[in-house]
Every structure is written in structure tokens, then in C-alpha cells.
């Protein structure tokens, strides 16, 4: 789980999960979610792995999507596409960097160019879809849970 700024609802529902069901970012960096999902899928091939991930952090280790396809791992990646390094904006505030200029703020914005996670995943040979509504996400997620193999769902935030 590397959904640092989008995953709070998920965390609130994991209190009763069995041990080692939720592997999370422990702080200090971003980008480990996709490789962590690979490790979980290799360690427990009989269990489906769901990897909730922010779009900014996923860009750090995007090549992991290729490994998921190459090894035919049963991983569903859910990308929260908020088009921002949102956690880094929060960290700027935490350290008192008030009034960051437009250039600094633009470095944390993921709009220029905009990442299209469906096309990125397809480029690695991975099935992918985009959800723009809750209903679309539920349908795509249900479909992913009923099938084996790697898949990516881009959720537009």
C-alpha cells in the first residue's frame, strides 16, 4: 500500500485483516509499492495481491509493471491519479516551507505532461482500465478480483 494521501478509507477498513495482509509504506520515501506487490505475489502465489498506489510514487518504479506481466503475477494495481506529488506538498507544509513559488509548486504537479496509466500499462503488456466514477471503479475492481493475472485500474481523483 503506497496510497499515502488517498488510502485513509482503506486503512480504516483493515483493522480486522489477518496478519501480513497489509504491507504499507513506513515513511521516508515513495516508490516502493509496486516492487513490494511483486514480492508479496511471489511469496504468496495462492493469494491475490492488490496494490493501491499514488501516481507520483508509481512513476518512480514503473518498470515493475513489466515484471508483473513477465512473471504473470496475480496483482491488481490501483493507481490513484491525483496528478500530484501530494505527499511532497504535505511535507513542504510540515517543514514550514510556506509560500513556495510557482516553479517549486510546478515540480510537484503531474499535469505537464499528463501520465496516462492505461497506456503505460498497455505498453508493458498489462490489461488496464480507467475509472472516472465510483460505479466504474466497482465494476472494474470486481472484474479484476474474478480473474487471475496482472491488471491495472487508474482511478481519476
Stretch-by-stretch model annotation:
Residues 46-60, 75-80:
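A short, small-residue-rich loop immediately preceding and capping a beta-strand
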Residues 1-3, 23-24, 51, 130, ...:
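General beta-strand structural signal in soluble alpha/beta enzymes
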Residues 9-15, 35, 62-65, 87-92:
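Short acidic, glycine/serine/threonine-rich loops at helix termini
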Residues 29-31, 58-59, 83-87:
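Short gly/pro/ser/thr-enriched loop/turn and capping motifs at secondary-structure boundaries
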Amino acid at each position: 500500500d503506497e496510497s499515502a494521501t488517498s488510502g485513509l478509507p482503506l486503512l480504516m477498513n483493515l483493522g480486522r485483516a489477518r496478519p501480513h495482509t497489509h504491507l504499507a509504506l513506513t515513511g521516508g520515501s515513495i516508490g516502493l509499492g509496486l516492487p513490494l506487490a511483486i514480492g508479496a505475489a511471489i511469496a504468496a502465489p495462492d493469494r491475490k495481491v492488490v496494490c493501491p498506489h499514488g501516481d507520483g510514487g508509481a512513476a518512480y518504479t514503473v518498470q515493475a509493471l513489466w515484471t508483473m506481466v513477465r512473471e504473470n503475477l496475480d496483482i491488481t494495481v490501483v493507481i490513484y491519479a491525483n496528478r500530484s506529488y501530494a505527499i511532497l506538498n504535505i511535507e513542504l507544509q510540515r517543514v514550514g516551507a510556506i509560500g513556495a513559488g510557482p516553479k517549486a509548486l510546478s515540480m510537484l504537479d503531474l499535469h505537464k505532461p499528463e501520465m496516462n496509466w492505461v497506456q503505460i500499462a498497455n505498453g508493458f503488456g498489462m490489461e488496464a482500465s480507467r475509472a472516472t466514477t465510483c460505479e466504474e471503479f466497482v465494476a472494474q475492481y470486481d472484474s479484476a478480483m474474478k480473474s487471475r493475472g496482472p491488471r491495472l485500474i487508474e482511478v481519476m481523483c
